[in-house]
């Protein structure tokens, strides 16, 4: 058994044992977080040849990702209705990207899952944005309302674009105003 004098000495002057325990905890925590979030030291990352186009360079060079929700402004939906329709679009887009490109989804989540809501004047603009986004290879989700409350059944209410590279999404929606 440990003598009382050793316990008292440790309690008054913890010294090397506490230092060793702290360093060990820090190393384990750092290693665990690095493994969890896939961070690698710069020395282990290969440089890419600028002459070859990879999926990352095609998708976006800024390294930033976002999702845009485009709301039709001509329908004059209430705040709750807009929130519900945007939620439908966000969940639909999330499910699509989860199936089609889990790596991109991980990058978007790592960026903090940014979502921006903008407004479009009418349905025609919504369809034009959808077409442009598809041409650029972006994930899209067009929401049609069931028509049980405020608006006509089948009305196209919200277009979700992304998650995807911010620079590509800005080519489609950069001119729209915030909702």
Swiss-Prot record:
The protein's GO terms of the molecular function aspect are:
peptidyl-tRNA hydrolase activity
UniProt xrefs under InterPro entries: Pep_tRNA_hydro_II_dom_sf, PTH2
Q: What does UniProt give as GO cellular component?
A: cytosol; mitochondrial outer membrane
Primary localization:
mitochondrion
EC no. given is 3.1.1.29
> What GO biological process terms are annotated to this protein in UniProt?
negative regulation of anoikis; positive regulation of anoikis
Query: Which major enzyme category is it?
Result: hydrolase
Compartments it resides in? Mitochondrion outer membrane
CDD domains tied to this protein: PTH2 (cd02430)
Give TM regions: 10-32
Kindly provide the PTM information from the record: Ubiquitinated by PRKN during mitophagy, leading to its degradation and enhancement of mitophagy. Deubiquitinated by USP30.
What keywords sit in the KW lines? Hydrolase, Isopeptide bond, Membrane, Mitochondrion, Mitochondrion outer membrane, Transmembrane, Transmembrane helix, Ubl conjugation
**Membrane topology listed for this record:** Single-pass membrane protein
Q: Cross-link (Glycyl lysine isopeptide (Lys-Gly) (interchain with G-Cter in ubiquitin)) at which positions?
A: 76, 81, 95, 106, 115, 171, 177
Q: Which reaction does it catalyse?
A: an N-acyl-L-alpha-aminoacyl-tRNA + H2O = an N-acyl-L-amino acid + a tRNA + H(+)
SUPFAM superfamilies reported for this sequence: Peptidyl-tRNA hydrolase II
Top-level taxon of origin: Eukaryota
What binding partners and quaternary form does the record give? Monomer.
Role according to the record: Peptidyl-tRNA hydrolase which releases tRNAs from the ribosome during protein synthesis. Promotes caspase-independent apoptosis by regulating the function of two transcriptional regulators, AES and TLE1.
| Family that this chain belongs to | Belongs to the PTH2 family.
Protein name from the UniProt record: Peptidyl-tRNA hydrolase 2, mitochondrial
Q: In the UniProt record, what gene is named as encoding this protein?
A: PTRH2
């Amino acid at each position: 058994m440990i003598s009382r004098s050793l316990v008292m000495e440790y309690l008054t002057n913890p010294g090397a044992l506490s230092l060793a325990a702290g360093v060990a905890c820090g190393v384990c925590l750092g290693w665990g977080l690095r493994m969890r979030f896939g961070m690698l030291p710069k020395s282990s990352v290969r440089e890419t040849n600028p002459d070859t186009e990879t999926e990352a360079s095609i998708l976006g060079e800024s390294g930033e990702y976002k999702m845009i929700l485009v709301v039709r402004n001509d329908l004059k939906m209430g705040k709750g209705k807009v929130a519900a329709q945007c939620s439908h679009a966000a969940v639909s887009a999330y499910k699509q990207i989860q199936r089609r490109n889990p790596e991109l989804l991980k990058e978007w989540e790592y960026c903090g899952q940014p979502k921006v809501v903008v407004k479009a004047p009418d349905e025609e603009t919504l369809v034009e944005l959808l077409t442009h986004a598809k041409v650029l290879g972006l994930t899209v989700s067009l929401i049609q309302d069931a028509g049980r409350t405020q608006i006509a059944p089948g009305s196209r209410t919200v277009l979700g674009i992304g998650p995807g590279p911010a620079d590509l999404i800005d080519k489609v929606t950069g001119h729209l105003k915030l909702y």
